[in-house]
From Swiss-Prot:
Name of the gene: gloB
Species of the source: Cereibacter sphaeroides (strain ATCC 17025 / ATH 2.4.3) (Rhodobacter sphaeroides)
Protein name from the UniProt record: Hydroxyacylglutathione hydrolase
UniProt EC number: 3.1.2.6
Residues binding Zn(2+) 1, per UniProt: H56, H58, H114, D133
Role summary: Thiolesterase that catalyzes the hydrolysis of S-D-lactoyl-glutathione to form glutathione and D-lactic acid.
GO biological process, one term: methylglyoxal catabolic process to D-lactate via S-lactoyl-glutathione
Catalytic activity of the protein: an S-(2-hydroxyacyl)glutathione + H2O = a 2-hydroxy carboxylate + glutathione + H(+)
Homology family: Belongs to the metallo-beta-lactamase superfamily. Glyoxalase II family.
Annotated NCBIfam families: GSH_gloB (TIGR03413)
CDD domains reported for this sequence: hydroxyacylglutathione_hydrolase_MBL-fold
Amino acid sequence: MPLELVTVPCLSDNYAFLVHDAASGETAVVDVPEAGPVMAALAERNWRLTQILLTHHHGDHVAGVAALREATGARVAGAAADAHRLPPLDLALAEGDRVRIGSEDGTVLEVPGHTVGHIAFHFADSGLAFTGDSLMAMGCGRLFEGTPRMMWQSLRKLSALPADTLICSGHEYTQANARFACTLEPENPVLIFRVGSIAAARKEGRPTVPSQLSDEIATNPFLRAGEAALKAAVGMADAEDAEVFAEIRRRKDNF
């Protein structure tokens, strides 16, 4: 049976994710921007929290960890490389390590760029990838610590996951990201269609996260930096893919 996913809005535009295994009763949360909404979502479902999985060290992803750990006794797992600036870890993780929820193993992927110690969690059997602020719906995280080439390689790693994977990213930035994408390719019909779908979802108050990887591959400019059409759109037809990515990221930073 696939893991059950609940998207929990936090702060002004963050998301935490509850991941529940019905057979065992185990529940994990991925990132804890604040404890209150996560505890409310657990109580509403009468779920028992057993694990806290962290993608990176930024405060808007870990601020609620201490309170949630104290309330539930859940074990905390995060990147070994960032152990010195994460809340105290019970389990320090690196590329290829496994985390288990019930009977399903998830694989740890190192995806530096937004931060140098950023990790993602891929639960292949349930088709879920928790990407934090690396790959995001219609976008990617700012490069606060890593280089453009580093982030491009991380995005390529994530884009190689199965196309029907649900990308569970950390923020509701999708509509702004879509507006930026339209400045690059204002006449791209696939992009225009997705922009309309995003606008409709937000008008109805629905989250646009998670998104499907196939949609990101088709419309997310940060995943498409290697495509001839997008290279031409930014005037870099003969440039290396990582250089095109860097230019797209520069433009987004100034958008």
